[in-house]
Regions:
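Active-site-adjacent structural elements that line small-molecule/cofactor binding pockets in enzymes
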Residues: 1-346
Length: 346
């Protein structure tokens, strides 16, 4: 199982965080993910990280597909792969309607079909083929009558470092997970629960794998967790509980909350409904209190060293191949030491 770092949303401490990341690379960390959401864009930060690192893989965690044209997404991935010397993987996802429509001002429609078309177009660009695509959602070049009529198939001017840049798709629902297992090199999970994951995702993963091109290789399964080795996990788990309450209760509308839907499929139907009711009514403390202890503990990597080692084994046994951690230690030195300790436990 590979060990990686999940950077936080950029702010005043970005340069210091990258300085720290360089030290993590020296200690054996193999991959770093840079988020985007509706913060600073991930691409500019990834370029900075590429210039400061030499070995670790870089991935976007995630860029969403509605705010960029498919060919721009492909160009950007090829550019990041170029400046990093072939170390970039494209983390791509649909985000959700509140961000897509509320921040970018474009309709949130057909996320699965759009994702499939975008991946097809990206791979054409990376193979340096003249881009010709006639899909339901994207047409390249535009056909006669849809523009000036002067568009023609073009191929990327530059020769990409690699003709196949790995694609990591963020997926939660059964159909999106099945599609990911079919067409992508990697799967970005959400709130991965090692003991309950198979009951939710084993079927969709099997359905997609049956259609998978063997040339893609085995599916890389990425899970993100807050992490700390500590004999007193209470306050750190409370912080994770607050984050779960936010996502389950308020990260999306009542009728369209992917985190809430996932937790229901994990078997916490009553709790998910209660968390959402409390959160959307402004009762944040009650929403936190309603988050099941098992969900908090199982989606974090927080506790004594022996416990953390056991949980690492549980993640690996459940199929996770890349673990991206957010170290919770309060100082740079403590975070570096914690990640070195985790490296020894993996």
């Amino acid at each position: 199982m590979r060990l990686g770092i999940m950077l936080g949303y950029s702010g005043e401490g970005f340069a210091a965080a990258v300085d720290e990341l360089v030290e993590h690379e020296r200690s054996g960390v193999e991959i770093v993910a840079v988020p985007e959401a509706y913060s600073f864009d991930a691409v500019s930060q990834l370029g900075f990280v590429a210039a400061r690192t030499t070995r670790m893989e870089l991935t976007s965690g995630i860029v969403q597909l509605y705010s960029r044209t498919p060919t721009l997404t492909a160009m950007t991935a090829a550019g990041l792969d170029y400046v990093s010397g072939g170390r970039f993987s494209l983390g791509l996802g649909a985000s959700g309607p509140q961000v897509v429509e509320g921040f970018h001002g474009v309709p949130y429609d057909a996320p699965l079909a759009r994702t499939r078309e975008i991946v097809e177009i990206c791979r054409q660009v990376w193979r340096r083929e003249p881009v010709v695509h006639s899909g339901r959602h994207y047409r390249v070049p535009l056909p006669p009558g849809a523009g000036t009529g002067l568009g023609k198939p073009l191929k990327l001017i530059n020769h990409p470092v690699r003709p196949r840049i790995p694609v990591i798709l963020a997926a939660v629902g059964p159909r999106s997970v099945a599609m990911t297992a079919e067409i992508a090199e990697g799967w970005w999970t959400l709130f991965f629960h090692p003991e309950r994951a198979a009951s939710v995702w084993a079927g969709p993963l099997a359905d997609g794998t049956r259609l998978r091109d063997p040339a893609l290789g085995p599916l890389d399964v990425l899970a993100t967790v807050p992490f700390a080795v500590t004999d007193d996990p209470g306050s750190l788990l409370d912080a994770h509980r607050a984050m779960l309450a936010l996502y389950i209760g308020g990260m999306g509308a009542r009728e369209r909350n992917f985190s809430n839907e996932l937790v229901r499929r994990y078997g916490y139907e009553r709790e998910a409904a209660l968390i959402q009711d409390h959160f959307l009514s402004g009762r944040r403390a009650e929403a936190m209190a309603a988050v099941p202890d098992d969900l908090v503990r199982s989606t974090a990597l927080v506790g004594p060293a022996a416990y953390v080692k056991d949980r690492l084994a549980a993640y690996a046994a459940a199929g996770v191949t890349t673990l991206l951690v957010s170290p919770l230690a309060p100082t740079r030195e403590a975070r570096l030491a914690a990640v070195r300790q985790l490296r020894d436990l993996v």
